[in-house]
């Protein structure tokens, strides 16, 4: 589930501006060792100077997995919220995951559980997926695919 507009609002609420929040993101990336990552916006949409690597995505995902709330969000098929719009009206919204593992549209081998993951798609990045799996012994594995031309193939390759 993505909500680019929500990411921007959260950035402004936390840091006072999107630029200040992006600076915090870049500092945190450096802190966890994601030294080949540079953010220019909070929402992840394409920008020429906005980049990362598979390894840095792993580091960021691994850091996020240390928070129980993040692990819970990864497993959600949908999220419902009620919020107040700028004009004062109450808006009811539902966001649904596009992750085919989470939705149950794609199966995994016996003994493996698709715990959850994050999809991302832009024209420049194409279809991307960072996915957490767990085997029957409880061992966890993070798999990452970037730049897949077709979303359907993304899940076959994973």
Predicted regions located by residue number:
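Domain-terminus/edge residues, biased toward the C-terminal soluble/receptor-binding domains
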Residues: 34-35, 49-51, 55-56, 61-158
């Amino acid at each position: 589930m993505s909500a680019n507009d929500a990411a921007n609002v959260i950035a402004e609420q936390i840091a006072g501006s999107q630029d200040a929040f992006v600076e915090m993101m870049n500092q945190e990336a450096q802190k966890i060792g994601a030294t080949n990552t540079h953010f220019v916006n909070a929402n992840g949409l394409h920008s020429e100077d906005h980049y990362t690597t598979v390894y840095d995505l792993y580091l960021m995902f691994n850091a996020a997995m240390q928070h129980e709330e993040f692990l819970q969000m990864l497993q959600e098929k949908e999220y419902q919220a009620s919020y107040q719009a700028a004009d004062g009206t109450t808006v009811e919204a539902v966001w649904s995951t596009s992750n085919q593992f989470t939705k149950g549209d794609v199966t995994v081998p016996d003994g493996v559980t698709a715990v959850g993951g994050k999809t991302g798609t832009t024209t420049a990045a194409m279809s991307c997926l960072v996915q957490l799996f767990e085997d029957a012994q409880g061992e966890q594995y993070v798999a990452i695919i970037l730049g897949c031309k077709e979303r359907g193939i993304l899940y076959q390759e994973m």
